[in-house]
Amino acid sequence: GEAVAGVMTGGVVSLPLTASAHQARLALACHDLRHLVVVDGRGALAGLVSRVDLYTSRSLDVEDLVEAIHAATNIAALAQAAHRVREAAARRVEDGTAAHVCEWIAILNDLVVLSAVDLAEAEFELPLVPWCWLAFGSEGRLEQTLDTDQDNGIVFVPESERDTETLRQRFLPFARRVNEVLDACGFPFCKGDVMAGNPRWCLSMTEWRGQFAGWMSCATPDDLLNATIFFDFRAIAGDVTLAARLQQWLLANAGDNDLFLRFMAANALRGGPPLGRIRDFVVDRESGLLDLKRDGSRIFVDAARILALALGVSDTATSGRLEAAGALLGWPRREVDACLEAFDFIQQLRLRGQREKAGPPNRIAPSALNELEHAFLKESFRQARKLQQKLQF
């Protein structure tokens, strides 16, 4: 008879008992699995969950999209599948929390990136050394919205440091091709050129450590202004253990670097939420609009990043970082919940605005809100201000 090794599923993916059904659906989609292992707090087997258990008619579009992405054998087909993801995401904006919608978008976008890497890799003969495709910024945090560009890089490990430049020149044409494929799939080139096809962000493990060490030894807070998105990196394709190794090194070196953390906090505190003493909101003088990203969600993202680096938290998502920080610092549960709900509400408004395409992305007129939304946004900004007050280093 056939050996069990020929029919078994390797690389078992597990989730804790505390994981939501939504997280389980996303894990099934991302890894193209039929079953997930559920473990308890000690890591012991607690049960199994299957696609049949989790998928309803309301969520079948996930399976359809996953199948379309996996079936794409050329750029045109992949671009069409990516377009379908964005259309489905726009429909989901009113159905779930912003955290779930953004995570749903990011996971499916991960599959698009994986397919883009596979398509590009078939065109090149890559070096036989470990390498990993990294996502930075919102994709690294699992917080991509409907309006997003690409921020990515490569980390590789040469057999000898002398081979670094030669290997980089081997990886760059491949990386640029992936960037081109992603652009064709609706992920525009990064305006700041934070892409793997840029030699600055196609680095060896040693070079990445040197890059982070340089940022962590900056002379002024200004030197860090354009570096923050790199501290949200996450593995997408290739040898994912390289990203884990780099993150372990980063957390080991960032937590006790008080000057670096103070500089990060100083930058995070440069702009506060747009709350007025007389009026409810301080809007832009010319447009009369609020910038929900710059003056809202950014505050939560920046604070969560700093707390994660200070406390050694490996989670890259803002909500996960705040949850972990709250547990480690003993924040009352109601404070953590209020903070998470405030961030989610601002993200929900951003998603709604991007779906409606009624004006500039991430900007909103207070007059467009109903009375309840107006009050909720005001309280969300207050929660942002409270969170900023916790950044004392």
Model regions and ranges:
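Bateman (tandem CBS) regulatory domains
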Residues: 1-12, 149
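A glycine-centered beta-loop-beta connector
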Residues: 1, 7, 28, 36-54
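The conserved cystathionine-beta-synthase
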Residues: 14-33, 39-40
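Conserved residues at the C-terminal ends of beta-strands
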Residues: 10, 39, 156
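Histidine- and aromatic-rich ligand-binding microenvironments
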Residues: 20, 53-54, 149
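Sensory coupling linkers of modular signal transduction proteins
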Residues: 52-66
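A nucleotide- and high-energy phosphate-metabolite-utilizing enzyme signature
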Residues: 64-393
